[in-house]
Amino acid sequence: MESDVCRLLDEIQRDIDEEHLVFARRDFECKLEHHKAIRPLLLRRDSVISEALLEMYWGRALAGFDAARGILPRDGCDRTSTQWMRSLVAEYLDGYGYRVHIELNENEFVSNRTLTKRVDLSLASVEKTGVVWRGNRRYPVFEFFESDTQDLDMFDILYELYVNSASYFLMSSRSHPMP
């Protein structure tokens, strides 16, 4: 009797998993379509940032993004550190994948000047730069770039920051105006 129930539950769970895969694919395609639609705006924003020489733009945007607090490094005084981020690009890719690229300022956490991770979700393949650590402290935002996992949760956080960075920068600027 119990084995019949277990077999039935296993079958139901397989069906649920199959339906979820179909949903996940449709969800991804919708996000990719949206990303393509806003990409010209993102490139325009990135150009404005570059032309205005807003060197600490990304650090300040990150400082205004409360959802990222748990993944960020802390400095020697145990304060959240955001000055290490020079630039960020996070994007959905054709073929069911994503890419995150960060340029870094000199910092006390890692020696890398760039970190890149590219994931193909259909092939379950991950290309990554790896991390050259300074010291023994580890932080999720950097560990993401040495992990072989797809880690969609971390991608979602970084994508949110990338897409809405102007809002987070402006929030941070209102509470800490630039000189």
UniProtKB/Swiss-Prot annotation:
Stored SUPFAM superfamilies: NAP-like
InterPro entries the record matches: NAP-like_sf
Highest taxon of the lineage: Eukaryota
Protein name, UniProt field: Uncharacterized protein ECU01_0210/ECU01_1400
